[in-house]
Protein backbone atom coordinates (compact mmCIF):
# COMPACT_ATOMS: atom_id res chain seq x y z
CA UNK A 1 0.00 0.00 0.00
CA UNK A 2 1.09 3.56 -0.67
CA UNK A 3 0.50 6.07 2.13
CA UNK A 4 0.63 9.85 1.98
CA UNK A 5 0.65 11.68 5.31
CA UNK A 6 -0.16 15.41 5.36
CA UNK A 7 0.69 17.58 8.37
CA UNK A 8 1.96 21.06 9.12
CA UNK A 9 5.30 19.59 10.29
CA UNK A 10 7.23 16.35 9.85
CA UNK A 11 9.10 15.00 12.86
CA UNK A 12 8.87 18.37 14.64
CA UNK A 13 6.45 19.33 17.39
CA UNK A 14 3.90 17.00 18.94
CA UNK A 15 1.86 16.25 15.81
CA UNK A 16 4.94 16.07 13.59
CA UNK A 17 6.48 13.44 15.86
CA UNK A 18 3.27 11.42 15.83
CA UNK A 19 3.14 11.53 12.03
CA UNK A 20 6.79 10.50 11.76
CA UNK A 21 6.15 7.59 14.15
CA UNK A 22 3.07 6.42 12.23
CA UNK A 23 4.97 6.66 8.95
CA UNK A 24 7.92 4.62 10.22
CA UNK A 25 5.61 1.95 11.61
CA UNK A 26 3.99 1.46 8.23
CA UNK A 27 7.30 1.52 6.40
CA UNK A 28 8.48 -1.25 8.75
CA UNK A 29 5.43 -3.25 7.66
CA UNK A 30 6.56 -2.96 4.05
CA UNK A 31 4.33 -0.10 2.92
CA UNK A 32 5.53 2.78 0.76
CA UNK A 33 5.11 6.10 2.56
CA UNK A 34 5.69 9.81 2.14
CA UNK A 35 5.09 12.77 4.42
CA UNK A 36 3.90 16.07 2.97
CA UNK A 37 4.52 19.00 5.29
CA UNK A 38 4.28 22.77 5.30
CA UNK A 39 6.57 24.40 7.84
CA UNK A 40 9.35 22.27 9.34
CA UNK A 41 10.90 18.83 8.97
CA UNK A 42 13.51 17.16 11.17
CA UNK A 43 14.45 13.70 12.42
CA UNK A 44 12.96 12.17 9.26
CA UNK A 45 16.02 10.37 7.94
CA UNK A 46 14.99 7.66 5.49
CA UNK A 47 11.47 9.05 4.97
CA UNK A 48 10.62 10.56 1.56
CA UNK A 49 9.32 14.09 2.13
CA UNK A 50 7.13 16.38 0.04
CA UNK A 51 7.41 20.04 1.09
CA UNK A 52 4.26 22.03 0.38
CA UNK A 53 5.32 25.46 -0.81
CA UNK A 54 8.15 27.55 0.62
CA UNK A 55 8.70 29.52 3.85
CA UNK A 56 7.73 32.60 1.84
CA UNK A 57 4.42 30.99 0.88
CA UNK A 58 3.69 30.32 4.57
CA UNK A 59 4.54 33.91 5.52
CA UNK A 60 2.25 35.32 2.84
CA UNK A 61 -0.55 32.97 3.91
CA UNK A 62 -0.10 34.02 7.55
CA UNK A 63 -0.14 37.71 6.60
CA UNK A 64 -3.31 37.20 4.59
CA UNK A 65 -4.94 35.65 7.64
CA UNK A 66 -3.79 38.44 9.94
CA UNK A 67 -5.44 41.01 7.67
CA UNK A 68 -8.48 39.18 6.28
CA UNK A 69 -9.06 36.31 8.74
CA UNK A 70 -9.16 33.69 5.98
CA UNK A 71 -6.52 31.22 7.14
CA UNK A 72 -6.67 27.95 5.25
CA UNK A 73 -7.60 29.66 2.00
CA UNK A 74 -4.18 30.99 0.99
CA UNK A 75 -1.28 29.07 -0.59
CA UNK A 76 -3.23 28.44 -3.81
CA UNK A 77 -0.25 28.08 -6.12
CA UNK A 78 1.70 25.97 -3.61
CA UNK A 79 -1.28 23.67 -3.09
CA UNK A 80 -1.93 23.34 -6.82
CA UNK A 81 1.69 22.27 -7.37
CA UNK A 82 1.47 19.86 -4.44
CA UNK A 83 -1.69 18.22 -5.76
CA UNK A 84 0.05 17.52 -9.06
CA UNK A 85 2.71 15.67 -7.05
CA UNK A 86 0.00 13.75 -5.21
CA UNK A 87 -1.54 12.64 -8.50
CA UNK A 88 1.86 11.51 -9.75
CA UNK A 89 2.54 9.56 -6.54
CA UNK A 90 -0.97 8.05 -6.66
CA UNK A 91 -1.31 6.93 -3.01
CA UNK A 92 -3.81 4.32 -1.88
CA UNK A 93 -4.38 6.03 1.47
CA UNK A 94 -4.24 9.76 2.23
CA UNK A 95 -3.83 10.42 5.95
CA UNK A 96 -4.58 13.97 7.02
CA UNK A 97 -3.41 15.46 10.31
CA UNK A 98 -3.18 19.18 11.20
CA UNK A 99 -4.24 21.28 8.22
CA UNK A 100 -3.94 24.66 9.93
CA UNK A 101 -0.64 26.50 10.10
CA UNK A 102 -0.80 28.66 6.95
CA UNK A 103 0.60 26.11 4.50
CA UNK A 104 -2.20 24.55 2.45
CA UNK A 105 -5.37 25.68 0.70
CA UNK A 106 -8.20 23.59 2.11
CA UNK A 107 -10.53 24.55 -0.74
CA UNK A 108 -8.23 23.04 -3.37
CA UNK A 109 -7.28 20.10 -1.14
CA UNK A 110 -10.83 19.02 -0.38
CA UNK A 111 -11.90 19.66 -3.95
CA UNK A 112 -9.37 16.98 -4.89
CA UNK A 113 -10.29 14.66 -2.00
CA UNK A 114 -13.98 14.76 -2.92
CA UNK A 115 -13.35 13.18 -6.33
CA UNK A 116 -10.06 11.28 -6.01
CA UNK A 117 -11.58 7.94 -4.96
CA UNK A 118 -8.87 7.32 -2.36
CA UNK A 119 -9.29 6.05 1.18
CA UNK A 120 -8.93 9.08 3.45
CA UNK A 121 -8.17 9.11 7.18
CA UNK A 122 -8.21 12.34 9.15
CA UNK A 123 -6.66 12.35 12.61
CA UNK A 124 -7.90 15.36 14.58
CA UNK A 125 -5.46 16.74 17.15
CA UNK A 126 -7.62 19.73 18.14
CA UNK A 127 -10.96 21.35 17.31
CA UNK A 128 -9.96 23.56 14.36
CA UNK A 129 -11.72 21.35 11.81
CA UNK A 130 -15.18 22.25 13.13
CA UNK A 131 -14.78 25.90 14.15
CA UNK A 132 -14.57 29.15 12.24
CA UNK A 133 -10.98 29.77 13.33
CA UNK A 134 -9.80 28.51 16.71
CA UNK A 135 -8.33 25.12 17.66
CA UNK A 136 -9.59 25.35 21.28
CA UNK A 137 -12.64 26.97 22.80
CA UNK A 138 -13.78 25.35 26.04
CA UNK A 139 -11.25 27.16 28.23
CA UNK A 140 -12.87 30.48 27.31
CA UNK A 141 -16.37 29.02 27.58
CA UNK A 142 -17.28 29.58 23.92
CA UNK A 143 -20.07 27.56 22.29
CA UNK A 144 -20.38 29.56 19.07
CA UNK A 145 -19.07 26.59 17.05
CA UNK A 146 -22.42 24.88 17.71
CA UNK A 147 -24.35 27.56 15.83
CA UNK A 148 -21.95 28.72 13.11
CA UNK A 149 -19.41 30.97 14.90
CA UNK A 150 -19.24 34.74 14.48
CA UNK A 151 -18.51 37.46 17.04
CA UNK A 152 -15.35 35.55 17.97
CA UNK A 153 -13.89 36.19 21.44
CA UNK A 154 -10.45 34.86 20.48
CA UNK A 155 -9.28 36.92 17.52
CA UNK A 156 -6.14 37.84 19.47
CA UNK A 157 -5.25 34.16 20.00
CA UNK A 158 -3.72 31.69 17.52
CA UNK A 159 -4.54 31.84 14.68
CA UNK A 160 -4.55 35.59 15.33
CA UNK A 161 -6.40 37.95 13.00
CA UNK A 162 -7.70 41.53 12.88
CA UNK A 163 -10.92 40.68 11.02
CA UNK A 164 -13.68 38.45 12.30
CA UNK A 165 -14.40 36.15 9.36
CA UNK A 166 -15.30 33.20 11.60
CA UNK A 167 -18.93 32.96 10.49
CA UNK A 168 -17.89 32.92 6.83
CA UNK A 169 -15.04 30.47 7.49
CA UNK A 170 -17.32 28.14 9.44
CA UNK A 171 -19.78 27.96 6.56
CA UNK A 172 -17.00 27.37 4.01
CA UNK A 173 -15.36 24.66 6.13
CA UNK A 174 -18.68 22.91 6.74
CA UNK A 175 -19.35 22.81 3.00
CA UNK A 176 -15.84 21.58 2.21
CA UNK A 177 -15.40 19.04 4.99
CA UNK A 178 -18.76 17.23 4.83
CA UNK A 179 -19.86 14.59 2.34
CA UNK A 180 -16.35 13.39 1.41
CA UNK A 181 -16.53 9.76 0.18
CA UNK A 182 -14.35 7.16 1.93
CA UNK A 183 -13.33 9.52 4.74
CA UNK A 184 -13.07 8.35 8.35
CA UNK A 185 -11.96 10.23 11.46
CA UNK A 186 -9.61 9.32 14.28
CA UNK A 187 -9.27 11.11 17.61
CA UNK A 188 -6.93 10.46 20.56
CA UNK A 189 -9.42 10.91 23.41
CA UNK A 190 -13.02 10.40 24.48
CA UNK A 191 -13.11 14.10 25.31
CA UNK A 192 -12.47 15.08 21.69
CA UNK A 193 -14.70 12.30 20.35
CA UNK A 194 -17.60 13.76 22.32
CA UNK A 195 -17.09 17.20 20.76
CA UNK A 196 -16.74 15.78 17.24
CA UNK A 197 -20.00 13.86 17.68
CA UNK A 198 -21.74 17.20 18.29
CA UNK A 199 -20.16 18.95 15.29
CA UNK A 200 -20.88 18.99 11.55
CA UNK A 201 -18.39 16.11 11.23
CA UNK A 202 -20.68 13.80 13.23
CA UNK A 203 -21.75 11.67 10.25
CA UNK A 204 -18.28 10.29 9.54
CA UNK A 205 -17.07 6.98 11.01
CA UNK A 206 -15.08 7.86 14.15
CA UNK A 207 -12.38 5.78 15.85
CA UNK A 208 -10.74 6.38 19.22
CA UNK A 209 -6.99 5.81 18.84
CA UNK A 210 -5.02 7.10 21.85
CA UNK A 211 -1.58 8.50 21.14
CA UNK A 212 1.46 6.44 22.10
CA UNK A 213 5.09 7.22 22.89
CA UNK A 214 8.30 5.46 21.95
CA UNK A 215 9.17 3.13 24.87
CA UNK A 216 12.78 3.13 23.72
CA UNK A 217 12.90 6.84 24.62
CA UNK A 218 10.38 7.36 27.40
CA UNK A 219 11.32 5.02 30.22
CA UNK A 220 13.04 5.55 33.61
CA UNK A 221 16.35 7.16 32.66
CA UNK A 222 19.20 7.95 35.05
CA UNK A 223 21.07 11.26 34.85
CA UNK A 224 23.18 13.72 36.83
CA UNK A 225 20.60 16.51 36.48
CA UNK A 226 19.82 16.53 40.21
CA UNK A 227 23.44 17.27 41.07
CA UNK A 228 23.83 19.69 38.18
CA UNK A 229 20.89 21.82 39.34
CA UNK A 230 21.26 21.21 43.11
CA UNK A 231 18.01 19.29 43.42
CA UNK A 232 19.29 16.27 45.38
CA UNK A 233 17.28 17.09 48.49
CA UNK A 234 14.26 18.68 46.84
CA UNK A 235 10.82 17.29 46.02
CA UNK A 236 10.79 18.17 42.34
CA UNK A 237 7.54 19.36 40.75
CA UNK A 238 7.95 19.34 36.96
CA UNK A 239 6.00 21.08 34.21
CA UNK A 240 6.72 20.89 30.47
CA UNK A 241 5.28 22.73 27.47
CA UNK A 242 6.44 23.44 23.95
CA UNK A 243 4.77 26.87 24.12
CA UNK A 244 3.52 28.22 27.44
CA UNK A 245 0.32 29.78 26.13
CA UNK A 246 -2.31 30.78 28.74
CA UNK A 247 -4.31 27.54 28.61
CA UNK A 248 -1.17 25.57 29.56
CA UNK A 249 -1.38 26.98 33.09
CA UNK A 250 1.79 29.02 33.62
CA UNK A 251 -0.04 31.43 35.93
CA UNK A 252 -1.22 28.49 38.02
CA UNK A 253 2.39 27.32 38.35
CA UNK A 254 3.38 30.78 39.60
CA UNK A 255 0.61 30.69 42.20
CA UNK A 256 1.45 27.09 43.06
CA UNK A 257 5.11 27.89 43.72
CA UNK A 258 4.06 30.36 46.43
CA UNK A 259 2.03 27.66 48.18
CA UNK A 260 4.78 25.04 48.39
CA UNK A 261 7.43 24.76 51.12
CA UNK A 262 11.16 25.24 50.51
CA UNK A 263 11.55 21.47 50.41
CA UNK A 264 9.75 21.53 47.03
CA UNK A 265 11.17 22.96 43.82
CA UNK A 266 9.12 23.76 40.75
CA UNK A 267 10.99 23.10 37.49
CA UNK A 268 9.47 24.38 34.23
CA UNK A 269 10.84 23.36 30.84
CA UNK A 270 10.14 25.24 27.61
CA UNK A 271 10.38 28.75 29.07
CA UNK A 272 11.84 31.37 26.66
CA UNK A 273 14.88 33.17 28.04
CA UNK A 274 13.12 36.55 28.23
CA UNK A 275 10.35 35.02 30.31
CA UNK A 276 12.76 33.14 32.59
CA UNK A 277 13.87 36.41 34.17
CA UNK A 278 10.29 37.39 35.02
CA UNK A 279 9.37 34.24 36.96
CA UNK A 280 9.70 33.91 40.75
CA UNK A 281 13.13 32.88 41.99
CA UNK A 282 11.75 29.69 43.53
CA UNK A 283 10.94 28.41 40.03
CA UNK A 284 13.76 26.82 38.04
CA UNK A 285 12.88 27.95 34.52
CA UNK A 286 14.67 26.23 31.64
CA UNK A 287 14.45 26.36 27.83
CA UNK A 288 13.35 23.39 25.75
CA UNK A 289 15.47 20.29 26.13
CA UNK A 290 18.05 19.48 23.47
CA UNK A 291 16.38 16.17 22.66
CA UNK A 292 13.80 13.67 23.87
CA UNK A 293 16.40 11.67 25.80
CA UNK A 294 17.13 14.69 28.00
CA UNK A 295 13.40 15.21 28.45
CA UNK A 296 13.07 11.61 29.64
CA UNK A 297 15.82 12.31 32.18
CA UNK A 298 13.84 15.24 33.58
CA UNK A 299 10.64 13.21 33.75
CA UNK A 300 12.52 10.50 35.65
CA UNK A 301 14.15 12.96 38.04
CA UNK A 302 10.83 14.59 38.97
CA UNK A 303 8.90 13.38 41.99
CA UNK A 304 5.65 14.52 40.41
CA UNK A 305 4.62 15.81 37.00
CA UNK A 306 1.97 18.55 36.95
CA UNK A 307 -0.11 19.59 33.96
CA UNK A 308 -2.40 22.49 34.92
CA UNK A 309 -3.62 22.84 31.34
CA UNK A 310 -7.33 23.61 31.21
CA UNK A 311 -7.83 22.24 27.69
CA UNK A 312 -6.03 19.40 25.94
CA UNK A 313 -7.20 16.86 23.38
CA UNK A 314 -4.84 14.23 24.78
CA UNK A 315 -1.87 15.28 26.94
CA UNK A 316 1.33 13.82 25.46
CA UNK A 317 3.57 15.14 28.22
CA UNK A 318 1.37 13.43 30.82
CA UNK A 319 1.85 10.09 29.06
CA UNK A 320 5.59 10.68 28.60
CA UNK A 321 6.05 11.43 32.30
CA UNK A 322 4.02 8.40 33.36
CA UNK A 323 6.08 6.13 31.11
CA UNK A 324 9.19 7.43 32.90
CA UNK A 325 7.73 6.33 36.23
CA UNK A 326 6.55 9.72 37.50
CA UNK A 327 3.10 10.31 38.97
CA UNK A 328 1.10 12.89 36.98
CA UNK A 329 -1.31 15.40 38.48
CA UNK A 330 -3.81 16.99 36.09
CA UNK A 331 -7.01 18.99 36.20
CA UNK A 332 -10.35 17.26 35.96
CA UNK A 333 -12.57 17.55 32.87
CA UNK A 334 -9.85 17.57 30.19
CA UNK A 335 -8.50 14.75 28.06
CA UNK A 336 -5.45 14.71 30.36
CA UNK A 337 -7.71 13.11 32.95
CA UNK A 338 -8.11 10.04 30.72
CA UNK A 339 -4.33 9.64 30.44
CA UNK A 340 -3.66 10.25 34.13
CA UNK A 341 -6.32 7.82 35.30
CA UNK A 342 -4.93 5.11 33.03
CA UNK A 343 -1.51 5.47 34.67
CA UNK A 344 -2.32 5.88 38.35
CA UNK A 345 -2.27 9.67 38.32
CA UNK A 346 -4.25 12.22 40.31
CA UNK A 347 -7.08 14.34 38.89
CA UNK A 348 -7.50 17.52 40.93
CA UNK A 349 -10.19 20.16 40.93
CA UNK A 350 -9.18 23.29 39.04
CA UNK A 351 -7.05 25.74 41.01
CA UNK A 352 -3.46 25.94 42.33
CA UNK A 353 -4.67 25.29 45.88
CA UNK A 354 -5.91 21.84 44.81
CA UNK A 355 -2.66 21.11 42.99
CA UNK A 356 -0.71 22.05 46.13
CA UNK A 357 -2.86 19.75 48.25
CA UNK A 358 -2.19 16.80 45.94
CA UNK A 359 1.54 17.54 45.75
CA UNK A 360 1.95 17.83 49.52
CA UNK A 361 0.08 14.55 49.98
CA UNK A 362 2.48 12.79 47.60
CA UNK A 363 5.47 14.44 49.29
CA UNK A 364 4.28 13.16 52.67
CA UNK A 365 3.92 9.64 51.27
CA UNK A 366 7.43 9.83 49.83
CA UNK A 367 8.85 11.11 53.13
CA UNK A 368 10.95 13.63 51.27
Each language-model region and where it sits:
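Conserved acidic donor-binding segment of nucleotide-sugar-dependent glycosyltransferases
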Residues: 342-353, 361-366
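Short alpha-helical donor nucleotide-sugar binding micro-motif in glycosyltransferases
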Residues: 297-302
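Aromatic "clamp/platform" in nucleotide-sugar-dependent glycosyltransferases that forms part
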Residues: 310
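Conserved donor-binding/catalytic core segment of Leloir-type glycosyltransferases
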Residues: 186, 230-248, 254-257
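Short acidic/histidine- and often glycine-rich active-site loop of Leloir-type glycosyltransferases
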Residues: 277, 332-342, 346-347
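Short hydrophobic beta-strand element within catalytic cores of glycosyltransferases
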Residues: 327-330
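Nucleotide-activated donor-binding/catalytic signature segment of Leloir-type glycosyltransferases, i.e.
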Residues: 273-293
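Acidic anion/phosphate-binding donor-loop and adjacent secondary structure
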Residues: 194-197, 213-228, 277
Amino acid sequence: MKYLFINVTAGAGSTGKLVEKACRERMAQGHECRIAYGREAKNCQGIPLLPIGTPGDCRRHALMHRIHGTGGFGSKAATARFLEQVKAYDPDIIWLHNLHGYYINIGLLFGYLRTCGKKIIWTLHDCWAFTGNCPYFTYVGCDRWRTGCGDCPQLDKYPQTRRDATKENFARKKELFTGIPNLSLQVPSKWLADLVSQSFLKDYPLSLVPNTVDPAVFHPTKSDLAAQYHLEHKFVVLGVANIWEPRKGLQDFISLSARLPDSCRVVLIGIPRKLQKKLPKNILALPRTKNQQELAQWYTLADVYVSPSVEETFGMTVLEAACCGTTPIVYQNTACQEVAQAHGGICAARGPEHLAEAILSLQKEAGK
